[in-house]
Amino acid sequence: MDFEKEYLDAVLVTAGLLFMFLYHLFLLYQYIHDATKTSIGYENKDKETWVQKILKVTELQGTNDDAVGDNVSTGLSVISSNTSATMTLASISLTLCAVIGVWIASSTNKFFPLEMVYGNTSESIISIKYLCLLSCFLLAFSFFVQSARHFVHSNYLLSTPGATKEEDVEKVQKAVERGSIFWSLGLRALYFALNFLLWFFGPIPMCACSIVMVFVLYCHDFRKDSKQSDSRKKG
């Protein structure tokens, strides 16, 4: 029985992580080849259209300073709300990193009784669990900081007077899109952190969480209406 418990982590945890990695590779493949089939690509297209219309309306309004100011301020407030949400998640991720670091430094503390865990409960495995969880939160913090950086940059570009040329529109679109992509990457890091968190309860909950999460993410990441539109076009 000890032999089975010792190698249960190696089998189930590896299987759960492999399942998650393969799903995200499939999602990346779909995003590269046909971004509109994924929710991330579809939302990025909507944001590109939004930026284009914001700057186009600004150009058409011309010398009407009040209308132009209201239009730009609306765009800036939308981006600022995204920046605030990003910085909030970055702060939470950094705080959790600090908490985990203090927890690791205190060798006398235990997450919960090890007798409840069906799996490998050696000190080395517990250290690996902490390091994996800490790495996910550090990655999430890094991604959210990069997302906030691009959103702040798009604020500067959007508020630049006379920024209505095609080049200016593309710059704002790229900044907003990159901010959204890093936001999505930060959320993915938190999803992996949830899996590693359940690993503290044993390899079985971790593997089960990975499988359930993949099915939940699939329903969220892929658009059902894109399949219906494709079938209509073929028909």
Residue ranges and their predicted role:
Residues M1-D2, L94-Y118, F201-C207, M213-Y218:
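Juxtamembrane "helix exit" motif at the C-terminal ends of alpha-helical transmembrane segments
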Residues M1-L8, S73-I79, P113-L134, V172-L194:
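Juxtamembrane membrane-interface segments at transmembrane-helix boundaries in membrane proteins
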Residues D9-E43, M87-W103, Y130-H153:
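Hydrophobic alpha-helical membrane-embedded segments
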Residues L28-L76:
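Membrane-interface amphipathic/juxtamembrane segments adjacent to transmembrane helices
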Residues T38-T58, V117-Y118, N155-V176:
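Juxtamembrane inter-helical linkers in multi-pass membrane proteins
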Residues V72-I100, I181-C207:
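Transmembrane alpha-helical segments and their cytosolic interface motifs
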Residues K129, L133-N195, K224-D225:
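Multipass alpha-helical transmembrane domains of eukaryotic endomembrane proteins
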Residues Y218-D230:
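Juxtamembrane membrane-interface segments at transmembrane alpha-helix termini
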